[in-house]
Amino acid sequence: MGKIYMVRHGKAAAGWDQDADPGLDVMGHSQAEAVAQNLATRLTSPVAAYTSPLLRCRETAMPLEIMWQTQAIVEPRVAEIPSPTQDLVARTEWLRRVMVGSWTELSSDPKSAGIDFERWQSDVVTALVTLGASQDIVVFSHFIALNAAFCAATGANQVVAFRPDNCSVSVFESNGETLKLLKQGHEAKTQVN
């Protein structure tokens, strides 16, 4: 069985309503440095690292990549939840609306038509379960993707079952088939960016 250290990205330079793929702001870069130190302390030797393809996750992974002299593997299955629109303001309004509901409600939401959210949630979990089945790994991901993993591990059904802070680390365990939550990451009142 492997442990999965799932990290929410650092504070982004812009929110969902301002930029489709922002990097980190100054605080986010500091958070990324701190979480790299934290992970290097927790893990006695380098392990495989995976990152969402989005810039804020790739930049969060960079300090650990430098420290471990490795490169995180881009894993599209741990990217942020897809939205039914590319319009930045409309997608932010959509996200805020669906965040207060359940995964069941999201799957049947008429304004979210065309996206298979059950499949997306399953893809996130499958990536974690298979990549972490026999080895410890680090995964840099997103707020809602972390919630997808949390819900799979705990049986919760809310889209937002917990509020992972920027650069918080949640630890899961994979037996190759399911996820088990070992440690929930730090929560904060945080803006989804």
What are the residue ranges of the model-derived segments?
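Active-site-proximal alpha-helix that buttresses catalytic centers in soluble enzyme cores
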Residues: G2-E75
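Short active-site segment of divalent metal-dependent hydrolases/proteases
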Residues: A12, A145-L146
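Phosphate-handling substructures
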Residues: I66-D123, L182-K183
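Domain-level recognition of soluble alpha/beta enzyme cores
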Residues: A156-K180
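Short, solvent-exposed aromatic-acidic interface loops
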Residues: L182-N193
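Short aromatic-enriched loop/helix-cap "lid" or pocket-rim segments at secondary-structure transitions
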Residues: W16-D19, A61, P84-L88, N193
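Generic beta-sheet signal
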Residues: I4, V47, A133-I144
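Active-site metal-coordination segments of metallo-dependent hydrolases
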Residues: Q18-M27, S108-K111, I115, V160-A161
